[in-house]
Amino acid sequence: DRRQRQMCIRDSMWTEVCNKPEEVEYLIFPRLAAVAEGAWTFPVYKDWDRFLAALDNFTGHLDVKGITYARSMYNIQHKVTPMDGSLQVELECIRPDVEIRYTTNGSQPTAKSSLYERKWQVTTPQIIKSATFKNGKQMGQTLTLPIQWNKATAKRMLRSNPVERVMVNGVRGSLKYTDSEWASWTRNDSIAFTLDLRKREHLNKLVLGCINNYGMGVHKPKRVEVWLSNEDIEYWKVASKELDPEEIFREGTFIEELPFNLDDTGRYVRVILFGAGECPLTHVRPGQEARVCVDELIIE
C-alpha cells in the first residue's frame, strides 16, 4: 500500500499572480488547515462536521491576527439543467450548517427571503439571486443567475456529451472558463452537436458564445458551419464562418459572440466546429492544441 510508504504531504503555492501579501494570505488560508487535516488526521478520525468546528475555531484566530482569508466555503454552487422544456435549478453549499436564501426577481436576498429546500423548475426569464445565511447573517457572496430565454433554451441536444447541455440552460458563462457554464471537449479538431427544437420554426439568427483565454490556450474555432433539417435525416448548410489565425490567437481573456444569419426554417439545428489546431510558435503555449469552449447556443 503506497499510503504506508508515504513520508509526508506537500502543498504548493505559486505567486506569479499575487501582487501583495494579502493576496497570498487569501490563497493560503484556510486551505492550509485542510492540508494539515489530510496530513495529520488518521482516516478513522476524519469527519466533515468535526473539521468544520475546528476550522471555525481556526478562522477565529485568523480574524484576531488580522489575516485575510478566503470565505469561499460559504459560497453557493449552482446547476441549471435543461429538462424537456423547462430548466431545473439546483443550489448547494459545502457547509451543511448554513441556510440558502434566494429571490427570483433580481432583488438582494436577505435572511427573510425564500428558504431553499429543494431544486425547482423555471420556465420563464428571471434573475435568481442567492446567498448563505447563519443566525441571520449573510456568510458568503451573493450568487447571481440571470436566466435568459431563446428558441434553444431547455431544448433537447441529440446524441451529445452531457456537458453540452450547458449550452441550452439559459445561463451565460463568466470570464472563468472553469465556472461549469462552459462546454469543452477532449478532442477539438472537429466538434458537432445537434439541437431538436421540437417543431419546425423559422429561424432568423444563431449566436455562439465563445471565450478567449490566451494563457490557457482557449480560442475560437477556425471554422463554424450551421446545418438545418426537418427530419434529422437530410441536412442542408445555411451558414458558415471562417476565421484567420490573427483573429483566433489573440492575447487576453474575453468573451466573444459569433453571429450567423439563418433566415430559414427547420426543426433540427446542427453546429459543426473545427478547432484552430496547434497554437503557433509565438504563442505562450506553442504546439499545444487550442481548446474550444462554448457557453450558450442562442437562436432567435
Please describe what each predicted stretch is.
Residues 19-24, 44, 282-283:
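Short conserved micro-motifs at the rims of enzyme active sites and ligand-binding pockets
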Residues 237-248:
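Solvent-exposed serine/threonine-rich low-complexity stretches and specific carbohydrate-binding patches
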Residues 1-5, 9:
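Single conserved hydrophobic/aromatic residue that forms the stacking wall/gate
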Residues 42, 46-194, 207, 211, ...:
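Short, compositionally stereotyped local motifs that mark structural "simplifiers"
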Residues 177-237, 252-300:
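Aromatic, loop-rich ligand-recognition surfaces of beta-strand-rich domains
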Residues 10-17:
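Active-site clefts of carbohydrate-active enzymes
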Residues 28-29:
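Catalytic cores of enzyme domains
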